[in-house]
Amino acid sequence: MLESMYYEFFFIFPKERELFESFLLDATDLALEESSLEDLKAFDDKETIGFISQSSWRYFATHGPLKEDLKEKLPHLDHFVILRSEKDLNSSLIPALESFCLSLQENLQNEFDFFYLSRNLASKDWLEAYKQAILPVQCGKFYIHPSWHQKPSHIATDFSIMIDPALAFGSGHHESTSMCLELLSNLDLKHKNALDVGCGSGILSIALKKQGVSTLVACDTDSLAIEETLKNFSLNQISLSTQDEIICGSTQKIQGHFDIIVANIVADVIKSLYSEFVRLCNHTLILSGILETHLNSVLQIYYNGFEILEQQQRNEWVALKLLKKQSIN
């Protein structure tokens, strides 16, 4: 019997990483993992470190030679994206990514490039290695753990969240999600009504419910995210009240006002939602998923309607806790 295989792709996007990651999500409906050599060293993943350090990366550019193997020059490995699939996507995804790169060049009048590697692994070997590498993480008062790690007895159930990272859109391991959870940890949300925009895996919605919000509305334009949110609600034994809603769609489907809004999404979407957040927010707005290079453009838009209460930064990612100015309606 042939052994089932798993395919692993590594990407480096020197420019506009958010746009490339959004394209990968739309093109594959697969979860992405952002990583670095330091992350792999922390997990003692010597095999993967050897593979990405010693392999000849493929390179595509809209300028110079369009495609080549890098034999001696290695790309900067501080940040790369990992995508895993049960199918070999080399013949479909890579050409699509090249076309996307060329379309960005045409639309943005700039040069773009990316690096990539791929390999195939036995499914059982990859799954076992993956489980050994994913460890629980503390985010503020929340203890985030995968289903194969039991919660320690000293951790309160109220602050324990079970998420399987590779099967979800947010797990607490990414800087943007962990900062959101830390900012939420310091808030008294009992009897407040809350909105989670771009709910993904539902991790922030679960945190809001565990903090005692009276009403929760969560939305995402991706139907797969809605499925993940509902699955993780069940996994964490979170019950929805008659006032709670999980909506497949944008904020335009939502009415009312909310004491707390959280949005862990890309900066371009955050900027486009300013008027919606002014309409929906009564008090506190937490924004995350903002790359440092996009922070000033976000602040320029939000300055008129919100004041900054707290700003956090971890590596290149920034999270903001904002207060709505009462003069803005």
Swiss-Prot record:
SUPFAM superfamilies: S-adenosyl-L-methionine-dependent methyltransferases
Record GO biological process: methylation
EC number of this enzyme: 2.1.1.-
Domain of life per record: Bacteria
InterPro entries per record: Ribosomal_L11_MeTrfase_PrmA (IPR050078), Ribosomal_PrmA_MeTrfase (IPR004498), SAM-dependent_MTases_sf (IPR029063)
Entries under PANTHER family matching the protein: ELECTRON TRANSFER FLAVOPROTEIN BETA SUBUNIT LYSINE METHYLTRANSFERASE
Protein name in UniProt: Ribosomal protein L11 methyltransferase
Organism: Helicobacter acinonychis (strain Sheeba)
Lineage: Bacteria, Pseudomonadati, Campylobacterota, Epsilonproteobacteria, Campylobacterales
